[in-house]
């Protein structure tokens, strides 16, 4: 792919961006050196714990912060030094910042009447755009109400409609669901994804919630300590984490220190600390005897009766009822503790202190080198 074609298919490109507050040589570093390409029309999520730099990066795309070094390209054009009102992007904030003295329709119209970019709209065109946006978020019948008369979920829809009304090329969403209750948050995930698909606008979504990222995103960038740890589709991030941080941050996992025994094509055999054998993908550049860390998700393990052959002997240390699942902590013969999660009602239930056999699904381990 040519560089020109690549620029055209990327909505946002982050090039060697570094952000330091205060003195560039000695001040606190928010972003160390970030390179990212966000595709046109995709739902892209910046995911990470508090303080990882995800919100700082979003604010720099919006123009509320400026990079110490590097470029921010919007469809190939460097906008790193431009003020927010000169960027064809809009932001939906965690706190929706609706004007309390205006009706819902007036909130939407305000941004269209004062838009700094693009041609001015007439009153009839503004009214039609407001109707279209309220219909998009299913809020037409609330057009004359004030924000204080709406629920949190309804205010979130209005904030989204207001941000979409000027037809930005990129929409930035800064943890917009965090103030909603669980049921409403789950419903809004589906709505946001559907609206993004319908409008065709690139969405860049910031969250620390792994479930939000996994269920909504086309691709995810996982950040930690000002650096991008891994970029990929949700399934790749979860099933094939690039390093120990990603494996630990996304969902739950078991870490097992192991040694490479032998390689057989795309697979390899690894030995755990108690002599247990684990099969996992082979990694280039590793010779027999190399030390690695294996990551195995709890749902890839299964508990069987103690007299079942072929598994690893273990003892159930504890069990927790989670509704849809049962979660066990089991101890292997070498003393290591592993977490096992099984669907509730599909298998026998083990008691605390009971001997059992741990079965490991084939090719269920990920090999981590750091």
UniProtKB/Swiss-Prot annotation:
UniProt EC number: 7.6.2.11
Biological function: Part of the ABC transporter complex PotABCD involved in spermidine/putrescine import. Responsible for energy coupling to the transport system.
Residue ranges of every copy of the ABC transporter domain listed in the record: 12-250
SMART domains for this protein: AAA
Molecular functions (GO terms): ABC-type polyamine transporter activity; ATP binding; ATP hydrolysis activity
Binding site for ATP: 48-55
Known catalytic reactions: ATP + H2O + polyamine-[polyamine-binding protein]Side 1 = ADP + phosphate + polyamineSide 2 + [polyamine-binding protein]Side 1
Any Gene Ontology CC annotation: ATP-binding cassette (ABC) transporter complex
Transmembrane region(s): none
Keyword terms: ATP-binding, Cell inner membrane, Cell membrane, Membrane, Nucleotide-binding, Translocase, Transport
Subunit composition and interactions: The complex is composed of two ATP-binding proteins (PotA), two transmembrane proteins (PotB and PotC) and a solute-binding protein (PotD).
Places the protein is found: Cell inner membrane
Protein name: Spermidine/putrescine import ATP-binding protein PotA 1
Alphabetized PROSITE patterns for the sequence: ABC_TRANSPORTER_1, ABC_TRANSPORTER_2, POTA
Superkingdom of the source species: Bacteria
Family, similarity comment: Belongs to the ABC transporter superfamily. Spermidine/putrescine importer (TC 3.A.1.11.1) family.
SUPFAM superfamilies found in the cross-reference section: MOP-like, P-loop containing nucleoside triphosphate hydrolases
Stretches of the chain forming a coiled coil according to its record: none
Source species: Pseudomonas aeruginosa (strain ATCC 15692 / DSM 22644 / CIP 104116 / JCM 14847 / LMG 12228 / 1C / PRS 101 / PAO1)
InterPro entries named among the record's database cross-references: AAA+_ATPase, ABC_SmlMolc_Importer, ABC_transporter-like_ATP-bd, ABC_transporter-like_CS, Mo/tungstate-bd_C_term_dom, P-loop_NTPase, PotA-like, Transp-assoc_OB_typ2
Membrane topology value: Peripheral membrane protein
